[in-house]
């Protein structure tokens, strides 16, 4: 092989390597974009006791997350309170105003607790009645692990659809609120609630940090 032919071969190999590197870079970029598109939504919940950042598990609880974001986007949670607070258990909110009047909701959603996500400390789950498919707007944040609330064969659980990623100290502060009984107005009529914070803990807003 002459020196000239060798140079031609080397240039060809170099060009082929460049093309290969370019193609690999394009594939990697497309993969990263696909991952970004599939990323779970992040919301920030601003309360009178501080901010709570929550990742929503759209990949595991798509119906529940879509429902929660619908309420958030329409401002339903703004001005509602954590109306049920039990230390070493959970804090519940999303359904009542500061004067404990129940807000109107959309139709309830199907229970997704078969996703087998666990009610561990810091997770966010839907509140409901004894009817497993009765969840609407109310949710709770587990202050401790409450695995008895999970789905198991023959028993519907409470659907976990998110997790606190920042602000768990705020949840702990809320859980320590002084509580007592209070008169509430529900959709079914007057009722006395237990475990209501004496000083209302208000959700100022719930907004998206990422889609």
What role is predicted for each listed range?
Residues 4, 9-22:
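Bacterial N-terminal signal peptides that target proteins for export
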